[in-house]
Amino acid sequence: MRRLAPLLLASVLLAAPAHAEQDLLLGADMGSAAMTKAEMTRADVEALIAKADGKPIDLSDKALAGLDLSGLNLKGANLRTARLNKANLRGADLSGANLEQAWFIKADLSGAKLVGAKMFGITARDANLSGADLSRSMPIGDFKGANMAGATLVDLKGGADIKNQSMGLMRAVFVSVNLKGANLKGANLGRSRLEYADLTDADLTNVVLMGSDLSGANLTGANVAGADFKNVDVTAARLIDLQGQDSVKDWSARVNVDRAITQVSN
């Protein structure tokens, strides 16, 4: 029976739509990963940091769920495939860290510094990233339901990665994410999933959204100056009081506003 499992999964993936396939891949081990208990303490991690004497530490594949790692200097750390579900990383410095295929479900990363972090295949559903700095990072993974209010995502590299095919055509998943007031200036979110995302008053200046799904998203008051909306799905999206709309190339031709909500109903 166990031998049949991979075949059954493969048949499901072949029958599923592209974004459903990604959900299956990212969620396949969610249950077991979420239940893994921490194998280290905060003191253990602090000891590793002290011993490294300023060099990046290796926490790859470690079970760190629920740990309080708030405020720690984890700059450049290797956290690849680490399990940090419900961990407290508030204010931690994860700049340049390797977070590929790591688990951060319901983790607190508010105010954390993630500049230039590698996040290919990351799972951070329902995580708190409010006020975090993800500038120049590569969050090609699953952030469904996360809180990114007030976060800085300047020069984000979240577009679909067509070069790395090890996990299929991955893309940034920001479904139902709170990006209210977030700074996404110059971010690459091509082919990303942003259904029902809250982008109220967000700065989308020069953002690449080509081929993305913004259906049901709220862009009220957002600055879209210079943004690329080519082949973007805006079905039922709220495009009210947009700023910089006149500078968007071929706005009327590229954006099907007839499918969007462009004014407040009485």
Label the predicted regions.
Residues 5-15:
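Bacterial N-terminal signal peptides
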Residues 19-266:
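Tandem repeat scaffolds
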